[in-house]
Amino acid sequence: MLAWYWRENERILNFGEHITPYILNYFGVNWRNYSEKTPQDTECILIIGSELHLATIENLKKSGIKKFHIWGQGKGTGQTFDYRNYDINFYLVRGETTKQELKLPQNIPTGDPGFVMPLVCPIERQISKQIIYAPHHSNRNNLNTKKQILQYTDYFDVMIPRDKFIEKLHQLVNSEFVITNSLHISIICIAYGVPFCVCLLKGEKYNYPTKWIDVFDWIGIKLKLCASKEEGMDWWNTEVKNHPIPNTQHILNTFPKHIF
């Protein structure tokens, strides 16, 4: 089985991308990166990401993929498509917004696979004094200015070598507070109970707003784009800290191990 995700054949991956190979390896299934495709490979699974749109499906189809398996992927931007025109199985999509935009059957489960990380990689928090700034990969600029505004102690680069993911995951989970505008940094913080806020400064890109709606509607938390650490801490304490998240075991239970 092939697995397609952004930068899947690179040594350095975006933070959220690491979740795809980690979960696949956790289940011990036989899989390869899409970049290793041979003419005999005709099936592909899509897990973490916001690329569930027409261009992705069509490009994969043109490369010889005939059967698609979706477990957690969500709609971000791009054109919608009629799923009935493809041989495509939906085991899990990211949220209700994705289901609505693609007009998918209501019985398809929802949830982002990132939320199962504490189940497959348990970490006992040992809180450090680090206040981390972990911006989206497109917002990793003007760090000196941002440090003055946000008063963080440590910068967390979301572009991480494959062999450093678990080390960086521990750093994130053990931090005192996280300031971010990366969706999967936010998801991991929620999943592990790490205090965090979503902060967007002037000039920073708000990447794929619909993906944020997908996730935060699923959790039931009112998203706020904060402009300072103090505003973010207040949002965390009032909106997030005591808010329960849906049971994530059901996400793990939907994994289609039988297709491998």
Residue ranges and their predicted role:
Residues 1-260:
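Active-site anion-handling motifs in enzyme catalytic cores
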